[in-house]
């Protein structure tokens, strides 16, 4: 009697076959130890960020006795937990946002064209895999890579496009920004 695969397992494979070229970045790898009666058992923990460079990103952590296996587990978990982030002009965020996770606190700001990715370490990996080209980011809290990545993804999950905000409020996109002000003419001296 063969067991039926649980729901959700099949979708994972289909999504990878759809032609979504996922790129993954290894953020950190760490040797960890479990203390047992006979001494210490060493293993490796990996943190990986995965994205399609078109607005989808996810992160995952994996642990195993060998490094490649830990990276594989982390990559699988990252693919399962991907989120979609709306991007302005396909290159930056729609608005400034803050994200927190544990002691990790990050501030993300939209940037004009040509700025590039101004972000440190783990945050840079998230933006590169996400496909954002212009952003300014600052980590104010913990420097722990896990907390920085989780805070960054938490901030990105709050990002909303003007169209989605307008539909949620039952308004038109033009109503969100209000009437345009005419530029004040300089006074003659």
UniProtKB/Swiss-Prot annotation:
Keywords tagged on the record: Ribonucleoprotein, Ribosomal protein, RNA-binding, rRNA-binding
S5 DRBM domain boundaries: 22-85
An example molecular function term from Gene Ontology annotations: rRNA binding
Entry's Gene Ontology cellular component terms: small ribosomal subunit
Bias (Basic and acidic residues) ranges: 172-189
Transmembrane helix is among the record's keywords: no
Region (Disordered): 164-189
GO biological process: translation
Matches recorded under SUPFAM superfamilies: dsRNA-binding domain-like, Ribosomal protein S5 domain 2-like
Highest taxon, organism lineage: Bacteria
RNA-binding found in the keyword field: yes
Record note on quaternary structure: Part of the 30S ribosomal subunit. Contacts proteins S4 and S8.
Record family assignment: Belongs to the universal ribosomal protein uS5 family.
Comment text on domains: The N-terminal domain interacts with the head of the 30S subunit; the C-terminal domain interacts with the body and contacts protein S4. The interaction surface between S4 and S5 is involved in control of translational fidelity.
Biological function: With S4 and S12 plays an important role in translational accuracy. Located at the back of the 30S subunit body where it stabilizes the conformation of the head with respect to the body.
NCBIfam families cross-referenced by the UniProt entry: rpsE_bact
Protein name as catalogued: Small ribosomal subunit protein uS5
Natural source organism: Acidiphilium cryptum (strain JF-5)
Lineage, highest ranks first: Bacteria, Pseudomonadati, Pseudomonadota, Alphaproteobacteria, Acetobacterales
């Amino acid at each position: 009697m063969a067991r039926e695969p649980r729901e959700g397992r099949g979708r994972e494979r289909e999504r990878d076959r759809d032609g979504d070229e996922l790129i993954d970045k290894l953020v950190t790898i760490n040797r960890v130890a479990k203390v047992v009666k006979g001494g210490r058992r060493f293993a490796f923990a990996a943190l990986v960020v995965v994205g399609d460079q078109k607005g989808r990103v996810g992160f995952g952590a994996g642990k195993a006795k060998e490094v490649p296996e830990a990276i594989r587990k982390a990559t699988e978990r990252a693919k399962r937990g991907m989120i979609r982030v709306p991007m302005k002009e396909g290159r930056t965020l729609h608005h400034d946002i803050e994200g927190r996770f544990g002691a990790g606190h990050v501030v993300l700001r939209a940037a004009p064209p040509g700025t590039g990715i101004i972000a440190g370490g783990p945050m840079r990996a998230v933006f590169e895999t996400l496909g954002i080209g212009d952003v300014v980011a600052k980590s104010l809290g913990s420097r722990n890579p896990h907390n920085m990545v989780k805070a960054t993804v938490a901030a990105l999950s709050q990002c909303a496009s003007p169209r989605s905000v307008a539909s949620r409020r039952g308004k038109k996109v033009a109503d969100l920004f209000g009437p345009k002000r005419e530029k004040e003419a300089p006074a003659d001296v």
